[in-house]
């Protein structure tokens, strides 16, 4: 005989079922409401955007939430133990770096990076770009604009990629006026993520990969990899190229450059042919546990937020340490203090090796110059210069990736450790050369305890540099902006 439910049990089951249905209804309603709001955003655009629209303010008319958070990249109020979003004079903090870059523009000026809204302002004010008074002068090619503005793909489309690269930096000052923004990463009609610059697409193609087959989650990192990577200016045309053909590691790229017999510059003191790393953030991040587990750049640097029932990516791109509750704690249950200290612990260890490497490498350059002055020959110095090149490449590769000590801490410590070893080997090789010329005492070291002293030692006339830059900023830049406004390159909203 079947057991019958008691009356109260039946009512309990009924009420429970109704509660489940009610909760599910709320969830579905919320999802439908959010979907409807998303559809409403696309169906009720205030302006139609077609082609490459470089003016970020125009996108802001249709996507105010994203635009308002993007404008927050102008803020400079966050500082962590080692980084932040304010411009800090790194050469002032680490004067040895002036010596490491002797003969290269970075010895004049190098600060920590600010947010995307400052991209045009910072490159224009940097002493590294010089003071070009016309379209044909100045130390840098127009390739230096490539990652600074959505005006770049617009110009590439207008005049061709090769023609864009094969010009002086000052040639497009009145055209490249909008800072990094919407069109750099988004299709204008549907806002899908896209690749707006050729170098990444070309690098994939050379490896036999089709970047158009990337998943949406992969694209949340690949749009960043258009710029946050290692690259170089290839040939006389200064064609921007990623050295990925042999792989992502520091050794793979070194082999690529060695095979091409490439150097960014010849060091003014040691005469070593130096490789200048850019910012291999993407490559190093791919060697870390987060990327290997499928976490994208945007997951941590552009976390989701909700406003008025609308979920969207926060376009205030910044360090995840500034918003641990919306980044790290989405997956990790530890306290903010614990998670922050986990990051700092990794950074401190890498920073310790970095400091030692910079000191030894600066001494190697100075000792190499001393050896040349004592009559050393090219043959005698060959091994030492090779070791200096290898040591500095590893130092720069580790340092230029600002988040590398967190993204892939073991790899960064390995790279810096190998760099330190090679710097010490270089100093030993130089001492043997000096011994051949009858010199066995310690090489006298100059006072490079401040940025100013180091710059004077390597022969820079900083007063002249700053004076020329000041004149450029007062005369040429206003002309660029006036012309840009007249041609409608800047928004009038």
Swiss-Prot record:
Q: Corresponding gene?
A: nrfA
| Catalytic activity entry | 6 Fe(III)-[cytochrome c] + NH4(+) + 2 H2O = 6 Fe(II)-[cytochrome c] + nitrite + 8 H(+)
Q: Where does heme c 2 bind?
A: 182, 185-186, 315
* Entry binding sites for heme c 5: 290, 328, 331-332
Establish whether keyword Metal-binding is in the entry.
yes
Which key words are in the record?
Calcium, Electron transport, Heme, Iron, Metal-binding, Oxidoreductase, Periplasm, Signal, Transport
Sequence positions that bind Ca(2+) = 230-231, 276, 278
Pfam families (alphabetical): Cytochrom_C552
Indicate which residues the UniProt annotation says bind heme.
144, 147-148
CDD domains the record matches: NrfA-like (cd00548)
Provide the protein name: Cytochrome c-552
Statement: the UniProt record of this protein carries the keyword Calcium: yes
Q: Where along this sequence does the record place binding of substrate?
A: 231, 279
Cofactors: Ca(2+); heme c
């Amino acid at each position: 005989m079947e057991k019958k439910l008691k009356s109260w049990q039946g009512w309990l089951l009924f009420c429970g079922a109704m509660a489940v249905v009610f909760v599910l209804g709320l969830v579905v309603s919320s999802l439908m409401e959010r979907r409807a709001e998303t559809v409403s955003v696309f169906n009720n655009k205030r302006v139609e955007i077609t082609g490459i629209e470089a003016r970020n303010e125009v996108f802001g008319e249709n996507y105010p939430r994203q635009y308002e958070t993007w404008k927050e990249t102008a803020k400079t109020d966050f500082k962590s133990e080692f980084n932040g979003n304010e411009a800090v004079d790194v050469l002032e903090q680490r004067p040895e770096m002036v010596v490491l870059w002797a003969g290269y523009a970075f010895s004049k000026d190098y600060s920590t990076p600010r947010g995307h809204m400052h991209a045009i302002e910072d490159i224009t004010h940097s002493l590294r770009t010089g003071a070009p008074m016309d379209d044909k002068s100045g130390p840098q090619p127009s390739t230096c604009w490539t990652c600074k503005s959505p005006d770049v793909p617009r110009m590439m489309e207008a005049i061709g990629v090769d023609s864009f690269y094969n010009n002086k930096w000052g040639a497009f000052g009145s055209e490249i006026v909008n800072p990094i923004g919407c069109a750099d990463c988004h299709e204008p009609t549907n806002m899908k993520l896209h690749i707006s610059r050729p170098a990444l697409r070309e690098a994939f193609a050379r490896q036999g990969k089709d970047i158009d087959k990337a998943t949406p989650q992969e694209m949340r990192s690949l749009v960043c990899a258009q710029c946050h990577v290692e690259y170089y200016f290839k040939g006389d045309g200064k064609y921007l190229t990623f050295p990925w053909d042999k792989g992502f590691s520091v050794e793979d790229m070194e082999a690529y450059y060695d095979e091409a017999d490439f150097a960014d510059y010849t060091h003014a003191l040691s005469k070593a042919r130096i490789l200048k790393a850019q910012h291999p953030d993407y490559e190093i991040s791919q060697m870390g546990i987060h990327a290997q587990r499928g976490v994208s750049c945007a997951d941590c640097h552009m976390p989701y937020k909700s406003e008025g029932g609308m979920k969207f990516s926060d376009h205030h791109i910044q360090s995840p340490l500034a918003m641990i509750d919306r980044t790290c704690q989405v997956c990790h249950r530890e306290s903010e203090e614990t998670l922050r200290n986990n990051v700092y612990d990794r950074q401190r260890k890498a920073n310790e090796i970095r400091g030692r490497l910079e000191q030894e490498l600066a001494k190697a350059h100075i000792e190499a110059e001393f050896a040349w002055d004592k009559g050393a020959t090219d043959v005698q110095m060959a091994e030492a210069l090779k070791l200096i090149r290898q040591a500095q490449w590893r130092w720069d590769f580790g340092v230029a990736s600002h988040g590398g000590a967190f993204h892939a801490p073991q790899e960064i410590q390995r790279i810096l450790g190998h760099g330190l070893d090679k710097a010490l080997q270089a100093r030993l090789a130089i001492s043997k050369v000096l011994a051949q010329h009858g010199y066995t005492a310690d090489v006298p070291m100059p006072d490079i305890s401040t940025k100013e002293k180091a710059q004077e030692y390597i022969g820079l006339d900083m007063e002249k540099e700053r004076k020329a830059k000041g004149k450029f900023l007062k005369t040429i830049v206003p002309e660029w902006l006036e012309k840009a406004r007249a041609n409608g390159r800047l928004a009038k909203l």
